[in-house]
Amino acid sequence: MSTEKINLDIHKILTLLPHRYPILLVDRVLELEPHKGIKALKNVSINEPFFQGHFPKRPVMPGVLILEALAQAAALLTFAEEQPKDPENTLYYFVGIDGARFKRVVEPGDQLILNVTFERYIRGIWKFKAVAEVDGKVAAEAELMCTVKTADAAP
């Protein structure tokens, strides 16, 4: 990603995503190039509610939430392409996850860097290559497939 770099703060993210606490998992967009990719971050705090039970003696961010954070970054990339007509009534759904791999634990105090690259758009399905890193090391990776629906048209 290079040429035109767009970054978004939490205030702009809140206008684009319907997610709210405790499931909003993107704190800032560091770089976004429409139709190419996005680099975002999630600051992982000990105050996250999931750490109470996963795991109390050795808190680890659940892998499915890392994938969710990557999907939220993908949604921001999608909405940069195609601004929803009614953002408050627009939902972004997973339709598939392929090749998910978890390579390292994510712990309180880590800064999760979310890198998502656009691959293709076919028949209403967006496909992305997604990699989450901590300190330059891959924590998780997957291919994500998502679709956009209005809340009243959702399954």
Curated annotation (Swiss-Prot):
EC number: 4.2.1.59
Signal peptide: none
Active site: H54
Keywords, sorted A to Z: Cytoplasm, Lipid A biosynthesis, Lipid biosynthesis, Lipid metabolism, Lyase
GO molecular function: (3R)-hydroxyacyl-[acyl-carrier-protein] dehydratase activity
Cellular compartments per GO CC: cytoplasm; membrane
Gene Ontology biological process terms, A to Z: fatty acid biosynthetic process; lipid A biosynthetic process
CDD domains listed in its UniProt record: FabZ
Major place of residence: cytoplasm
InterPro entries in alphabetical order: FabA_FabZ, FabZ, HotDog_dom_sf
Enzyme class, broadest EC rank: lyase
HAMAP family associated with the record: FabZ
Family listed: Belongs to the thioester dehydratase family. FabZ subfamily.
Function: Involved in unsaturated fatty acids biosynthesis. Catalyzes the dehydration of short chain beta-hydroxyacyl-ACPs and long chain saturated and unsaturated beta-hydroxyacyl-ACPs.
Protein name per the record: 3-hydroxyacyl-[acyl-carrier-protein] dehydratase FabZ
The organism of origin for this protein: Burkholderia cenocepacia (strain HI2424)
Phylogenetic placement of the source organism: Bacteria, Pseudomonadati, Pseudomonadota, Betaproteobacteria, Burkholderiales
